[in-house]
From Swiss-Prot:
Belongs to the glycosyl hydrolase 11 (cellulase G) family. This is Endo-1,4-beta-xylanase 4. Residues 42-230 form the GH11 domain. Its EC number is 3.2.1.8.
Length: 231
């Protein structure tokens, strides 16, 4: 990642050469922000669509240096490093209570999740069935509802509220639902119906499904992930 000093020195020198009046602090800050954003866009821009018969979603706040690649079939790869948030993967649109079979070479350094990830509307819900994670268990700072046994493992169920945060409908306030596997794995089959049914029994209602992907997410961390899902 290019440092603040490198960007600021280069940009300020260019400004001074063009204008003998020294730039103000505000002008230097504006130069840095613009230069930083241009550098961040050296990664893969956010996008959604279809590829080789699968839906894909890739989102980044441009804070990290991150590259997303759609590979053949149900496979994708992500590499990332730096200060920012990113999430992407392949799957389906709309989502459903399907069995999701996946395999991954998942190598996080820091805060990251490997999960079945999706959204619903009415109510607006962002949900995660976390199969593996880096240094931070996302259920630890949420309201824990209990544990369930699914697919031969224990999952911690939790719920949290996101206030004025990015969503599939723009900046909104919405609920997050979590099932976090306590015995981490990077391949297997996830029975989404069992998770959805368990959530419903705890008062965690879903709405009409939007997309559903096997996602890699990174937050102020680094790592690499190659994931393949089955039809």
């Amino acid at each position: 990642m290019v440092s603040f000093t490198t960007i600021l020195v280069a940009a300020t020198a260019a400004l001074v050469a063009a204008n003998p009046v020294p730039p103000s602090i505000d002008e230097m800050r504006e130069i840095y922000v613009k230069s930083r954003d241009l550098h961040a866009r050296g990664g893969t821009p956010s996008s959604t669509g279809t590829h080789d018969g699968f839906y894909y979603s890739w989102w980044t706040d441009n804070g990290a240096q991150a590259t997303y690649t759609n590979n053949a079939g149900g496979s994708y790869s992500i590499t990332w490093s730096g200060n920012g948030n990113l999430v992407g993967g392949k799957g389906w649109n709309p989502g459903s209570a399907r069995n999701v079979t996946y395999s991954a070479n998942y190598r996080p350094n820091g805060n990251s999740y490997l999960s079945v990830y999706g959204w619903t509307r009415n109510p607006l819900v962002e949900y995660y069935v976390v199969e593996n994670f880096g240094t931070y268990d996302p259920s630890s700072q949420a309201s824990r509802k209990g544990t369930i046994n699914v697919d031969g493992a224990t999952y911690q169920v939790a719920q949290s509220t996101r206030t004025n945060q990015p969503s599939i409908d723009g900046t909104r306030t919405f609920q997050q639902y979590w099932s976090v596997r306590q015995q981490k794995r990077s391949s297997g089959t996830v029975d989404m119906k069992k998770h959805f049914d368990a959530w419903a029994s705890m008062g965690m209602k879903l709405g009409t499904h939007d997309y559903q992907i096997v996602a890699t997410e990174g937050y102020f961390s680094s790592g690499s992930s190659t994931v393949t899902i089955q039809r």
